Swiss-Prot record:
Residues passing through the membrane, by range: none
Pfam entry (one): DUF167
GO cellular component, one term: cytoplasm
Top-rank lineage group of the source organism: Bacteria
SMART domains xref list: DUF167 (SM01152)
Family note: Belongs to the UPF0235 family.
Signal peptide (UniProt feature, chain positions): none
Protein's name according to its UniProt entry: UPF0235 protein LHK_03181
Length: 97
């Protein structure tokens, strides 16, 4: 899984996001990234906030454990999540490969 790598204190996700979708959901793979559709529009950071909250909820970690590392104004994003193992993260994110 190229989209999921282990870090010292958790995992790093490589994501491709699609803001303005009908609903927020994991949509499968997009190249080497996990594709996530977001219901929030890409305006005033709403899509980023929606993404981080969605990941925190889905992985069962606090919102403060999820950090956007790069891609603030891009569809390609890198997110670090503390307090979860790669195995647990892969099991909690429904990916159709």
């Amino acid at each position: 899984m190229n989209w999921l790598t282990a870090t010292a204190d958790g995992v790093r996700l490589t994501l491709h996001v699609q803001p303005g979708a009908r609903r927020t959901e994991v949509a499968g793979l997009h190249g080497d990234a996990l594709k996530i559709r977001l219901a929030a529009p890409p305006v005033d950071g709403k899509a980023n906030a929606c993404l981080l909250a969605f990941l925190a909820r889905g992985l069962g970690v606090s919102r403060s454990a999820v950090t956007l590392k790069s891609g603030d104004c891009s569809r390609h994003k890198v997110v670090d999540i503390r307090g979860i193992t790669p195995e647990a993260a892969a099991g909690l994110l429904p990916v159709k490969e």
